[in-house]
Structures are given as C-alpha cells and as structure tokens.
UniProtKB/Swiss-Prot annotation:
Naturally occurring in which organism (per UniProt): Barbarea vulgaris (Yellow rocket)
MF terms (GO), sorted A to Z: glucosyltransferase activity; UDP-glucosyltransferase activity
Catalytic residue list: 24, 129
EC code(s) of this entry: 2.4.1.-
Pfam families: UDPGT
GO biological process: saponin metabolic process
Protein name in the entry: UDP-glycosyltransferase 73C25
Keyword Transferase annotated: yes
C-alpha cells in the first residue's frame, strides 16, 4: 500500500507506548508492524530492557524496510523505590513492587515531551496502553489524538463500561461469592465481584491509580482492539456505540507474524530449541496433544501445580506443559525430581521450562487443545489456531474471556475455577482444581463425544474466520484503513 500522508510531504507518524508487561507489549509490537506495513512512520517508546526483548523481531522488520524507530526512556528507580533494572511485571518476585512500578512508569512524562519535540516527522497520533495515563497529557500538549489500547476483547471492555455506569451493581452484592447478571448484554453473563475486570473493582492502594486510568480513558480519541468483528459481533457493535464509533477492531494482530522465526521469537527468545520441539510434535498423532500454558505471570501455588501435573499424567493424553519462572520455583523443581514425575511422563509429556514458541506450537497439526489461563493474547492465539480451549482463568479480564469462549462461542470447556488467584494470597487460596478435576476436564476437551466434536468443528470455523479478517478486504484489514483515514482527516483539519 502506498504511504499515507497527512499533507503533501509528511507521512503519518504514530508513536506507540506499550505498558511494561509481556501480555501488553507483545500485541503492541505487532500493531507497530501492521501500521508500518501501511506506510506509516512508527516510533515505539519503551525502556532499554523491554526494547531488548523485541530487538530481533523489530530488527528484522526494520531491515525489511519498515520505518520503525525505537526510543528509550529510563525509569526513576530511586525516586519510587524500585530495584535497579526492574522494568517488567514478569520480573516481580513480590506484589510490593506493583504500586512503585505503576508510579515509576507514569513519571517519565517530561522525558517523553523532550523526545516529542525532537521527533521528525511531527507525531500525528499516539497509541498508548491504558496503564499509561500520563500519555493523555502528552497528547494534549502536542495537540494530537490519543488512541487507547487495552489488550482485551470487546465483551470485557463492554462489561467494564456497563459496571462503571452502574456502580450500585457491585456495591449491592452481599458477598464475594454472590453472582450477578451483567445488564444490557446480548447474552446472559454471570460473574462474581472478584471476577470482574480489574479497573471496575479495586480494593486498597491501587484505587487512586485506577481512577486516573478511567479519566484518561474518557479523554481518549478512540480505542484500538485486538479482536475481529466476526468473533464477537454483538459486543463489537455495542462497544463501538459507547465510543461514538471510535473503536477499531484490527485483530488478530499476531497474524502479522508470518515467518517461522518471528512466530518462534514472538515476545521472547524460546527456552527450548525450536527443532527439538517440532520434532517431538511430529512424532505425535494429529490433534492428540494438549498444550498447557498458564501465562507469563502465573502465580499458582505449589500444591495446585502438583495437582495439575498429576491430572495431566493420569489423563494419559500427550501434552506440552510450559512452566514459566522455572528458575524461581525451587520447590517445584525438587518435586519434579524427587517424586519421579518428570521420569514417568518423559515419553508422553514435554516440559518447557521458561518461554515457549507458542505460536509455532499452536499451529502444529499434532496439537488438539489448549489449556490456557485465558489471558486475551493466548485466548485469541488459540482461537486463531482453530483449537478448542480448556479455560483456567487466574485474574483480571480472564474470567470475562472464559465466558466468551465457553458460553458465547461454545468452543471451550471450563476447568472449574471460580476464584481469582490473588497475589500474595496464593498459599491461603490453595488448590482450586484437584487432579481428578483436571483429568475430567482434559477428557471432556480431548475426547470423542458429540459435544467435543462439535466444539472442534466450531473452533476450526472460528480459526478460518480469524485468518479471513486480516486478509485484504477482511473486516480487520478494512478497519485499519478506516482508522488511518480518520487520523489523516483529523491531521489535515488541524493543519
């Protein structure tokens, strides 16, 4: 596509601000590449450590001719009391870092303003993660629109909107176990108070910060969403109406990763050799393997991880189990060794201790299901790969995502988790699904019942729709065009 310009000489220049958490950064880097492929100049503003995680993927994009720049800002470690070098949430070993981290990432406004003054061509638009409310002030100072990126589906965004407009719903609940029906929804969706998305019900110190997020949300020009219209049409339509039409569904953005190496290194370099992993998968029957990954900041206690492992073992299904934070999980390492678990499952199970090449694995013909924490990136990757999902939500938006997959799309099975895994209270919460529950859920997902076969058919159909959405003429491809036309017209009127 020819370069899109905002007047006779300058191309549109979008400046992207990803939040420093893996699940937020990965899709933002994909969005950067998608926009650069349309001829835009792109600048990504982040910290040195986070930039290094995407160095290889972005360098390949730049070498291919895409106009992407990366600028660094330094976090004020000493001012907020953060350990030097702690630049990403998945590096946390304690929730004590959360408040100073949120403060720190929002104290770089002055540095960013200096960067903006030197940028050429002049920035036309900001795309900012919703966790960085300071970018609203930058947008206002330089008189450019700010587009928000939440990293959630439209069902979840609509849920947050409805609950913010109707605060009495949560206030009137008698306990954290009481269910309520989300009003004004196309489907009957029931949640408990702890299951609602994060910024609608936040106890303690984070409340003030969340209020800043809500205010920044209100003043944003629009929202870019990593979903596609055919996946959740009623929710896309209703959420778009709440934003006066300024909501663009452009996903699945992960599909911009076409080369094998880009799929393998999406987000971080893998801790397993790609060829070794693919060779193992090649040895298994088609659609027989369950892929198990509970995200980059999984906080399940040791007792629950043991039950998960034993349930996978007793299911007799081949599986890949990704265990992130392996180096910090000394007790689990000891249990694997001393209990003989690793030895017993070696012919049927593959353990990946660290980061996995998830996109490569999910798209392999031997994989037939995905046990996921329902983080939106993973959920959408599973849907895009045409896989039925076994849902195990942990916190934040993940219970809403489970409702979408199991109830609305009919392409998933619940593991049976009812309670979020609160940081700092993991041991107290303990086991939510025992080994028998794991075994039963795996069999329900991977078995040959009529319901299981119907889920597989539905999942395959959704995967095909996902790929069509990003092709030329597809809904997401067209929505990127509409977004760029909107910003171009705005830039011309400002000029």
């Amino acid at each position: 596509m020819a370069s899109i310009t905002n007047h006779k000489s300058d191309p549109l220049h979008f400046v992207l601000f990803p939040f420093m958490a893996q699940g937020h950064m990965i899709p933002m880097v994909d969005i950067a590449r998608l926009l650069a492929q349309r001829g835009l100049t792109i600048t990504i503003v982040t910290t040195p450590h986070n930039a290094s995680r995407f160095k290889n993927v972005l360098n390949r994009a730049i070498e291919s001719g895409l106009p992407i720049n990366i600028l660094h800002v330094k976090l004020p470690y000493q001012e907020v009391g953060l350990p030097e070098g702690l630049e990403n949430i998945d590096c946390f070993d304690s929730m004590e870092h959360m408040i100073p981290f949120f403060k720190g990432v929002n104290m770089v406004e002055e540095s960013v303003q200096k960067l903006f003054e030197e940028m050429s061509p002049r920035p036309s638009c900001i795309i900012s993660d919703f966790c960085l409310p300071y970018t609203s002030k930058v947008a206002k100072k330089f008189n450019i629109p700010k587009i928000l990126f939440h990293g959630m589906c439209c069902l979840c965004l609509l849920c947050m909107h409805v609950l913010r407009k109707n605060p009495k719903i949560l206030e009137n609940l008698k306990s954290d176990k009481e269910h309520f029906v989300v009003p004004y929804f196309p489907d009957k969706i029931e949640l408990t108070r702890p299951q609602v998305p994060m910024d609608t019900y936040v106890p303690g110190e984070l409340k003030e910060f969340m209020e800043d997020l809500v205010e920044a949300d209100k003043t944003s020009y629009g929202v870019i969403v990593n979903t596609f219209q055919e996946l959740e049409p009623a929710y896309v339509k209703d959420y778009k109406e709440t934003r006066s039409g300024k909501a663009w569904s452009v996903g699945p953005v992960a599909l911009c990763n076409k080369a094998r190496i880009d799929k393998a290194e999406r987000g971080n370099k893998s801790d397993i050799d790609q060829d070794e992993c693919l060779k193992w998968l090649d040895s298994k029957e088609e659609r027989s393997v369950l892929y198990v990954c509970l995200g980059s900041i999984c906080n399940l206690p040791l007792a629950q991880l043991k039950e998960l492992g034993l349930g996978l073992e007793e299911s007799t299904r081949p599986f890949i189990w990704v265990i992130r934070g392996w180096d910090k999980n000394k007790q689990l390492v000891e249990w694997f060794s001393e209990s003989g678990f690793e030895e017993r499952i070696k012919d049927r199970g593959l353990l990946i201790k660290g980061w996995s090449p998830q996109m490569l694995i999910l798209s392999h013909q031997s994989v037939g299901g995905f046990l996921t924490h329902c983080g939106w990136n993973s959920t959408l990757e599973g849907i895009t790969a045409g896989l039925p999902l076994l849902t195990w939500p942990l916190f934040a938006d993940q219970f809403c995502n489970e409702k979408l997959v199991v109830q609305v799309l009919n392409s998933g099975v619940r593991a049976g988790v009812e309670q979020p895994m609160k940081w700092g209270e993991e041991e107290k919460i303990g086991v939510l699904v025992d080994k028998e529950g794991v075994k039963k859920a795996v069999e329900e997902l991977m078995g040959e019942s009529d319901e299981a076969n119907e889920r597989r058919r539905r999942a395959k159909e959704l995967g095909e729709l996902a790929h069509k959405a990003v092709e030329e003429g597809g809904s997401s491809h067209s929505n990127i065009t509409f977004l760029l036309q909107d910003i171009m017209q705005l830039a011309q009127s400002n000029n």
